[in-house]
Amino acid sequence: MRIEKHRTPLSKGIIWTILSVCLLFMFTTLILVIVATAGSTANYKPLTNIYIGEADIKHINVSKVIPQIGPILTILGSALTAPNSSLDDIFGAMKNIADTPALTPLLTLLSNADNTTVTIESLTELAPLAISGNPASSTRQLTEINGLLKYSDNATETLDGLSRLVSASLSSASSNSSSDSTTLVLDLLKDSDNPQNSTDALLTLNNLTMSEKAQLLPVFRLFAFSTNQTATMTALATLMNTTISSSLAQTLLTQLQNTISNGGSLNNTFSTLQPLVPQASAPAFDAVELLLNQTTSTNQTLSTLSDLLEQNLTQSSSAKKAFAALTQLMENSDNSTMVVTSVQSLAAVTNTTQSTQQLIGLDDVISSSSNTNETLSILSELQSGLSGNSSSVQYIPYLFSLLGASTDPKTTFSSLVTLTSWAQENPQTFLPILDILADAKSVQPISAEELNAMTPNILEYLKIPIYYRLSIFTLCHANLENKILDCNSPHAVQNLDFRSIIYDALVTSDFQPYLNALNISANDLYLEGKLLHREHQYVPAVRSVLALNLLAIIFSFFTMIFIILLYFNRYMFKQPLWLIALALHVCVGVATVLAAIIISVMIAIIKSGTADDKYGVVFKAGPAYTGLIWTAFALSFIATGLIIYTWWRNRRSGRYMSGSVTNRKGEIYTYGDGSAISADRFGDHNLGDDDDADFEKQVNRNEITAIDNSSSANNTDVTGSTSNRTELSHPDVTPKDSNGPVNNNAHLVA
């Protein structure tokens, strides 16, 4: 046996105090983590104030998140800036038609507006057509235009062409033109086997100058005297494509004229002249013979041919071009007489700009049509209706302005037809909508800053939640005043799908009719950007935090059990129990600090994403939840420190070391965490001589004295400490006189 330096051990009173503090801290940690995890599982305060994070959408960029709503909000927001306008006036009127067939076409018209100013002006001007117009007439004309779009492969091109065509027709009607060129052209195209080709031919003829058109007069006269216009066209085509010398032409015409004057036979003359004609000019010679054989007036035909050759039309490039276009018209038509008559009338039109617009418009409409015959039939009916109804004509320019300002003219027009039909049957319900349009027209379009400022009030009026409080198991909605509106039933861990969160809130609000009318689903919400790209980082965070919180709860519970065990004397100085308790304290601390860190990182990721994407959404951490988790970590950290301190002091003071001495009766006295062992088990190991026995007793007294003095140093009433006396008393061990000097540094090592 030998004596070493001995550190003053902690008394049981201090150990119990430390264990009590640790038990209290672990119990508090357990409660804090449970409350933080449960969060707003019950819809009452103060639990509703416990949430992981809160999304604030009062200044959400609606035009970016829901692009279809952007133009609508711009128009309605502009109306709100008008004098004496209020949310009830604007959105109350919209709410009145929410359950009617009018909401869908109205919102579609506004949503498709690429230029809200033009759209508002056009709708305002078209409104009387719906309210006070002739339902049968105005609706029929709109239906006819809608029919054109039905057969269109390119609605934009069709409407552009129709706009040119109708504008030109209206101009012609206002000038009282004696020749309705549009009607002539439509008749030509309806008779054509290839309307597209015929339209191109008419454009070619229309682009000729008046002098170039005059060159065609001999051609028209030849057709006028012809008994077989197909043969006449063939003969003229041959003349246009064959080179004939002027001398030969003059000789031929002179001989023919003499024959006619003398009453001779033209056939004999042609037979006589045939051998004299060069081979290259033979086709032209045969063409002249064909023309004279298929005419009602030989003299007039021969005179016309003479004029045609004298003007050298067969060599004129413009004449060749014009004749080629005329040939196309004849070939595509089953009524060559109508073709000649119509082309001759169109050639007399002096306003080529107007006629060009008509033909270009027709070309656009026909080229974009999937059914040319139906398209031409509808155009004829529309032309007839507009020319006979002056009351509808005044609305045509605004109609095409509306379509021109639309991103989807086809849908816009069909919506206008539907809305007009409904408004004519329900004028009183529709009048407040017209007031909204009038208010919007009377003021400047609302700016982005003004719209952003009034967004909170609009959202509040439509009962759309402003604040979204995310807990682990629940999601709560709050209004502009931070009052809880509702909390969903606790369910599986929140997956932080912001698209679904926002859409579900919209569906349960007064905004639902707008979503249904525009057929907007959750996938239509535009939330692309950094926030969604990092979804794989923050979505698993909530599940991780839940797992860590559960571990913290479990570890806290078992830590409390081991702390209670350490209260008992038989376990107080068992080093393995202290090490297990220490490990559990560390686990609680690690679980809570990781949960707190993960939430902080998740909040930072979401805040960064919403800021960079410029959605106007502000996300911040829940102060109550953050405080609970960090407090739980702080308590577990302090408790861990206390356990480490106590364990280390006990270890350094030898409390965990097994030691023994033999008393006068040969019995073993044990201390530390050793067990009492009978003296006879030691046999030869017992101290046999008196010197050794005296030495052992002295050592035992020193050990007892050291512990006694330690207890006296840590307790104010040494004599009253029954626990210490119980610990130190042992049979046949005589305490050392306390009046003498005490060696507090003596330590026995077996």
From Swiss-Prot:
<feature type="glycosylation site" description="N-linked (GlcNAc...) asparagine">
    <location>
        <position position="61"/>
    </location>
</feature>
<feature type="glycosylation site" description="N-linked (GlcNAc...) asparagine">
    <location>
        <position position="241"/>
    </location>
</feature>
<dbReference type="GO" id="GO:0005739">
    <property type="term" value="C:mitochondrion"/>
</dbReference>
<feature type="glycosylation site" description="N-linked (GlcNAc...) asparagine">
    <location>
        <position position="176"/>
    </location>
</feature>
<feature type="region of interest" description="Disordered">
    <location>
        <begin position="703"/>
        <end position="750"/>
    </location>
</feature>
<feature type="glycosylation site" description="N-linked (GlcNAc...) asparagine">
    <location>
        <position position="197"/>
    </location>
</feature>
<feature type="glycosylation site" description="N-linked (GlcNAc...) asparagine">
    <location>
        <position position="84"/>
    </location>
</feature>
<dbReference type="InterPro" id="IPR016024">
    <property type="entry name" value="ARM-type_fold"/>
</dbReference>
<feature type="compositionally biased region" description="Polar residues">
    <location>
        <begin position="703"/>
        <end position="726"/>
    </location>
</feature>
<feature type="glycosylation site" description="N-linked (GlcNAc...) asparagine">
    <location>
        <position position="299"/>
    </location>
</feature>
<feature type="glycosylation site" description="N-linked (GlcNAc...) asparagine">
    <location>
        <position position="714"/>
    </location>
</feature>
<keyword id="KW-0597">Phosphoprotein</keyword>
<keyword id="KW-1017">Isopeptide bond</keyword>
<feature type="glycosylation site" description="N-linked (GlcNAc...) asparagine">
    <location>
        <position position="709"/>
    </location>
</feature>
<dbReference type="GO" id="GO:0071944">
    <property type="term" value="C:cell periphery"/>
</dbReference>
<feature type="modified residue" description="Phosphoserine">
    <location>
        <position position="678"/>
    </location>
</feature>
<keyword id="KW-0496">Mitochondrion</keyword>
<feature type="glycosylation site" description="N-linked (GlcNAc...) asparagine">
    <location>
        <position position="312"/>
    </location>
</feature>
<feature type="glycosylation site" description="N-linked (GlcNAc...) asparagine">
    <location>
        <position position="335"/>
    </location>
</feature>
<feature type="cross-link" description="Glycyl lysine isopeptide (Lys-Gly) (interchain with G-Cter in ubiquitin)">
    <location>
        <position position="697"/>
    </location>
</feature>
<feature type="compositionally biased region" description="Polar residues">
    <location>
        <begin position="736"/>
        <end position="750"/>
    </location>
</feature>
<feature type="glycosylation site" description="N-linked (GlcNAc...) asparagine">
    <location>
        <position position="519"/>
    </location>
</feature>
<dbReference type="GO" id="GO:0015909">
    <property type="term" value="P:long-chain fatty acid transport"/>
</dbReference>
<feature type="glycosylation site" description="N-linked (GlcNAc...) asparagine">
    <location>
        <position position="154"/>
    </location>
</feature>
<feature type="glycosylation site" description="N-linked (GlcNAc...) asparagine">
    <location>
        <position position="207"/>
    </location>
</feature>
<feature type="glycosylation site" description="N-linked (GlcNAc...) asparagine">
    <location>
        <position position="724"/>
    </location>
</feature>
<feature type="glycosylation site" description="N-linked (GlcNAc...) asparagine">
    <location>
        <position position="228"/>
    </location>
</feature>
<feature type="glycosylation site" description="N-linked (GlcNAc...) asparagine">
    <location>
        <position position="267"/>
    </location>
</feature>
<feature type="glycosylation site" description="N-linked (GlcNAc...) asparagine">
    <location>
        <position position="115"/>
    </location>
</feature>
<dbReference type="GO" id="GO:0005886">
    <property type="term" value="C:plasma membrane"/>
</dbReference>
<keyword id="KW-0325">Glycoprotein</keyword>
<protein>
    <recommendedName>
        <fullName>Uncharacterized protein YKL187C</fullName>
    </recommendedName>
</protein>
<dbReference type="Pfam" id="PF06687">
    <property type="entry name" value="SUR7"/>
</dbReference>
<dbReference type="InterPro" id="IPR009571">
    <property type="entry name" value="SUR7/Rim9-like_fungi"/>
</dbReference>
<feature type="glycosylation site" description="N-linked (GlcNAc...) asparagine">
    <location>
        <position position="389"/>
    </location>
</feature>
<feature type="glycosylation site" description="N-linked (GlcNAc...) asparagine">
    <location>
        <position position="351"/>
    </location>
</feature>
<dbReference type="InterPro" id="IPR052413">
    <property type="entry name" value="SUR7_domain"/>
</dbReference>
<feature type="glycosylation site" description="N-linked (GlcNAc...) asparagine">
    <location>
        <position position="373"/>
    </location>
</feature>
<keyword id="KW-0832">Ubl conjugation</keyword>
<dbReference type="GO" id="GO:0051285">
    <property type="term" value="C:cell cortex of cell tip"/>
</dbReference>
<feature type="glycosylation site" description="N-linked (GlcNAc...) asparagine">
    <location>
        <position position="293"/>
    </location>
</feature>
<dbReference type="GO" id="GO:0031505">
    <property type="term" value="P:fungal-type cell wall organization"/>
</dbReference>
